[in-house]
């Protein structure tokens, strides 16, 4: 079986939106594959591969950040109203790009309390916590966005 990651090259440019633990790990891994990975945070960092994005304060990345972007991973949680902050502030910009792939990092919490049973993508979501309902709503927003999205739970 061919490894899909093997088709990545230094021509690929990733934006990792929300660079906590998972986003940082993803960016580090992508860089090891020879790709460019720029990461967002809510405050300025000394890292030249980092940029500021804060949807609550409406601090939007400079247009130049998006030049040549081929892939996006969003790790940013829902806002207090349960909407996706990336789509709320950047939807039109993202739709104007020639993206090959968009990933949205969700949670297995959308499956609800399975009392230890295994779940997979064939299981129906059944959230019981408010934050899981919000995540499920964001998943739906991404799916309906028309972008080439893949949901990770």
Task: Kindly label every feature range from the protein language model.
Residues 1-63, 74-75:
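Hydrophobic, well-ordered beta-alpha structural blocks that scaffold small-molecule cofactor pockets
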Residues 140-153:
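Conserved beta-loop-beta element that borders a ligand/cofactor-binding pocket
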Residues 26, 49, 82-86, 90, ...:
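Short glycine-/acidic-enriched loop or helix-start segments at secondary-structure transitions
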Residues 131-136:
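Active-site YXXXK catalytic motif of short-chain dehydrogenase/reductase
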Residues 47-57, 89, 116-121, 148:
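Active-site regions of enzymes building and remodeling cell-envelope glycoconjugates
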Residues 67-104, 137-140:
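NAD(P)-cofactor binding segment of oxidoreductase domains
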Residues 91-130:
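Conserved Rossmann-fold NAD(P)-dependent oxidoreductase catalytic core, especially the SDR/UDP-sugar
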């Amino acid at each position: 079986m061919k490894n899909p990651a093997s088709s990545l090259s230094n021509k690929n440019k990733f934006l990792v939106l929300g660079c906590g633990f998972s986003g940082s790990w993803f960016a580090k891994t992508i860089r090891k594959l020879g790709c460019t990975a720029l990461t967002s945070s809510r405050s300025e960092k000394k890292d030249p591969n980092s940029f500021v994005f804060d949807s609550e304060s409406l601090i939007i990345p400079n247009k130049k950040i998006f030049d040549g972007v081929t892939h996006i991973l969003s790790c940013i949680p829902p806002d207090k109203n349960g909407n996706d902050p990336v789509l709320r502030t950047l939807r039109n910009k993202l739709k104007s790009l020639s993206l090959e792939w968009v990933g949205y990092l969700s949670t297995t919490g959308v499956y609800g309390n399975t009392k230890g049973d295994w779940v997979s993508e064939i299981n129906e979501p059944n959230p019981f916590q408010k934050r899981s309902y919000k995540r499920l709503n964001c998943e739906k927003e991404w799916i309906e966005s028309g972008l080439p999205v893949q949901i990770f739970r």
